[in-house]
Each structure stands twice: as C-alpha cells, then as structure tokens.
Amino acid sequence: MNIVKRAVPELLRGMTNATPNIGLIKNKVVSFEAVGQLKKSFYKRQLPKQCLAFDSSLGKDVFLRALQEGRMENYFSLAQQMVTQNEPAFCGLGTLCMILNSLKVDPGRLWKGSWRWYDQYMLDCCRSLSDIEKDGVTLEEFSCLANCNGLRTITKCVKDVSFDEFRKDVISCSTIENKIMAISFCRKVLGQTGDGHFSPVGGFSESDNKILILDVARFKYPCYWVDLKLMYESMFPIDKASGQPRGYVLLEPMHIPLGVLTVGLNKYSWRNVSKHILQQAATVKNADNLAEILLSINQSSIPLIQERSNSSKSGDFEHFKECIRSTKTYHLFLKHTNTNVEYITMAFWAIFSLPMIQKALPKGVLEEIQSLLKEVEISEINTQLTALKKQLDSLTHCCKTDTGCCSSSCCKNT
C-alpha cells in the first residue's frame, strides 16, 4: 500500500511534467484548456434606475400607500407562495405554480409524502418539460397550462389592449381577491438584461402610478415597483420567435374539481389526433366505427386519457368507475378490449362532445353519439368529464393560436 501511495503522486507529477495542458485542481487531474472553457457565472443583477426595489426605503413607502388604497388584496397570498423558477426558462412555470398555490387550487396529485401541492415540474400538459426547459412557454401555452390545472383565464395580447384597459385590469386584479394577473414582458424596456419574461403582479399604487412585479427569477432581480406606463410599453417589443408582441393573463379559480384523470396529449399530439379523427369522420357508419378509431389511436400512441401522475384517489373514484361500467358507451368498447375501458370511454365522451368534431359527423352518426352523450348526465361522470373537456378546449385553442401572441424565447439571455 505504501508503494501505491508513493507511486500515485509520482505518476501525477510525471503527467504534469510530460503534458503542459494537464494540472491539479482540488486533487483532480484536469485540462487547463477545460478550465478556460468554464462558463462565466453571475450572482444577481443590479436593478436599473427605472425599477424601485420593493425592499428599499422608498419601495416600502410605495407599498404603504398602495396598502392604504386597497390595491394590495392579492399580495399576501402571493407572498406566501413566492418561488424561484426552477430553470432559466421556467419563468412561466414558476409564475403559474406560484399563482395556483396562491389561489389554493388542489392539484389532486401527490407532491411529496402524503401532501398534494403544486410543483413546477407538474406543469407539462401542453408541452414536454424538456421542450419548455429549452425555450419557455408562449402566452397561449401559459393560458392552456392554467386551464388544464383548474384556472379560468382571460388572455390579452397588448396589441389589442389600450393603456386605459390595461390600467383597469391592473386595478381589478389588485382590489379583488382570487383574481391575479400574470404578465409577459420584455426586460430590455425596463433597463434590465435579458429579454422575454413572465412574473405575477403583486399590487398597484394609484398615487405613485407604479405596479409591483414579483419577479420569479429571484437569483437575478428582486421584486420591484415600476411605472405602469413603462410596464405597458414593455409588452410591445416583437418577440423574435413569433413576430408578435407579448401580453398578460387574468387568472381566477375555475371551481371545478380537477379529478384523477387528465388528457394524456399535449398540443402537438392533440393536433394530430383531432386531424385524424376529422379526416375519418365523414366516412364512419356508426358509433362502433368511431370507437374503433379511438382504440387504434389509443393503442398506437400515448393514452388519450390517463391518471394524473401520483394522483390521490379515494373510494369515490371506484364508485365513479362503477358508474362508467353501467353505461352503453362502456360496453361499446368492451367488445373490442378489456384494458382501461373506463378511460377510453371517457375519451370518447370528451372528444365527441366537441362541436368541431360533431360538425364533421354524418347526421345519423351524430344522432347516435348524442344519445350516448346523455349518459354523462350522471353527476359522478359529469364532474370528471367537465375537467377533461376544459383541457381539450384549451389544447384546441392553443393549437389555433400557435403562431400568435408571444411564441416565447423566455429568459434565454442573462
């Protein structure tokens, strides 16, 4: 062993003497060339003069005035859920996660241990997290994610909104509990580094005409007050990825239980699935043909409907499945398969209740479908189905506006 201990340092000395590009850092052999290639790192950024630090003396004065004006109604619920975005391009996910927990939306799935709670890595219903990690989310994708997770949204692209309307929306969200604004803006207009970014709005001081931005990139900038007019202007610069300006979203709880089931498709796979169904719709003879189409799709791709990962189930869920098994639609599929029949039945009801699909069906088939759709009036089924239909509506809308307002390139620049 002593021979080995003496030999290793000798070997390393020999390597460093023989090869000038090799050295020791913390007892590890490394290439000096590799050291030169290490990424430059940063610790926070200085707020520009256009932004007033929330925790500064003047920032506290603005907060006090806004509080006295009654324009900080959502601040405290948001402050309790303040997060840092998990990845450089997760500003949209960080913002939405913060808002969902602030509005007390039950995700219906486990976070850790026995606790249900929203985490940024749960927000993947519109696009894969690996894609979002590369270039963030668009304004429409943000809305889609919010809808899929139990929020009602109104999305506004700044090119369609006057300053007065924006001001009214800011005041509304600052004075009404359970109504929060998420804003997508260009940092450069505020004198900051970087480009596109999402963050929640924490309040408004009418006397100072300043809006509070609760920046989710806490590793970079603190929370700050900024002039309302400047904030409005920060949404106008054209996003290079889309050729469109940015905007904002007004969010409120939907008051519809999310349930255990979720749509297994993202906006891209739903676009392909709906296109295939529409192409086949005109030639079908009966509901059984439609069932065969759905089964072929379900078997060749990811499931149309699936359980939320780590979902929290109760005895009510088993009763819900028993209700499905009592329907004609369930037995329509049971003739073809005995695997996850309850879930493909829910997919059938959700998809063929969409107006755009119904319009493509022959009259006789549509009448048969409408008869089967009456089975969803069972309350246990209808509750779960309503949430699934909302998700499909959101995915459909997101597909239609895919090249619309703010196809994001969030937070790519330091």
Curated annotation (Swiss-Prot):
Reactions that this protein is recorded to catalyse: [Glu(-Cys)](n)-Gly + glutathione + H(+) = [Glu(-Cys)](n+1)-Gly + glycine
Give a GO biological-process term: detoxification of copper ion
Keywords in alphabetical order: Cadmium, Copper, Metal-binding, Transferase, Zinc
Q: Name one GO cellular component term.
A: nucleus
Question: What does the similarity note say?
Answer: Belongs to the phytochelatin synthase family.
Role of this protein: Required for detoxification of heavy metals such as cadmium and arsenate.
Q: Which Pfam families match?
A: Phytochelatin
Q: Which Gene3D superfamilies match?
A: Phytochelatin synthase, N-terminal domain
Q: Which SUPFAM superfamilies match?
A: Cysteine proteinases
InterPro entries hit by this protein: Papain-like_cys_pep_sf, PCS-like, PCS_N, PCS_N_sf
Coiled coil location: none
Record protein name field: Glutathione gamma-glutamylcysteinyltransferase
Please give the PANTHER family that the UniProt record associates with this protein: GLUTATHIONE GAMMA-GLUTAMYLCYSTEINYLTRANSFERASE (PTHR33447:SF2)
Q: What class of enzyme is it?
A: transferase
What GO molecular function annotations does the UniProt record carry, in alphabetical order? Answer: cadmium ion binding; glutathione gamma-glutamylcysteinyltransferase activity
Residue ranges annotated for the Peptidase C83 domain, each copy included: 37-256
Q: What induces it?
A: By cadmium, copper and zinc.
* EC numbers, comma separated: 2.3.2.15
